[in-house]
Design a protein with these regions (language model features):
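Chalcogenol-based redox active-site neighborhoods
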Residues: 1-165
């Protein structure tokens, strides 16, 4: 694991990455990019949460908990982003697969791919030996300042309600 977390009250590490999104109007899943700089320019807050990997057993529970609360994040002028070290193609395949068959189905927020491990490393959540991230949640204000962080081991879930609060 990387041993240095970003510091509270300081600028969050900038990121830019490929994401997979679902367009509910067109009913299609597509690739896009996202960056913290662009979100800051739009004067929005960001919740960036890391999860260990696609197609795992605990991750869908949290991912769907975040999805059920998407309106709360939007009401708070906040962009929600899920991130793992999987590829964008893995994210897409997972999103295309129904929940009943081990997928996550369509989400109302993007999943960011970090196969280079760069983003997970910059946020201090990379488990180098596994090539995956811990369960980290980072709240970044509309000026790019890190306001909150919480990191859990891979096998321990997080409280989405606490993140919304």
């Amino acid at each position: 694991m990387s041993n240095s977390f970003p510091r509270l009250g300081k600028p969050a590490p900038l990121f830019e990455g490929d994401v997979v999104r679902f367009d509910s109007r067109k009913k299609e899943i597509f690739f896009d990019t996202i960056s913290l700089n662009k979100i800051i320019e739009e004067k929005k807050w960001t919740v960036l949460f890391f999860y260990p990997r696609d197609f795992s057993s605990l991750c869908p529970t949290e991912i769907h908990s975040f999805n059920r609360r998407i309106k709360d994040f939007e009401k708070a002028n906040c962009v929600l982003i899920g991130c793992s070290t999987d590829s964008k193609n893995s994210h897409k395949a997972w999103m295309e697969k129904p929940r009943t068959k081990g997928g996550i189905d369509k989400l109302s927020y993007p999943l960011m791919a970090d196969p280079s491990l760069r983003i997970a490393r910059s946020y201090g959540v990379l488990q180098r030996e596994l090539g995956q991230a811990l369960r980290g949640t980072f709240v970044i204000n509309d000026e790019g300042i890190l306001m909150s962080l919480a990191v859990n081991p891979s096998k321990i879930g997080r409280s989405v309600d606490e993140t919304v609060r």
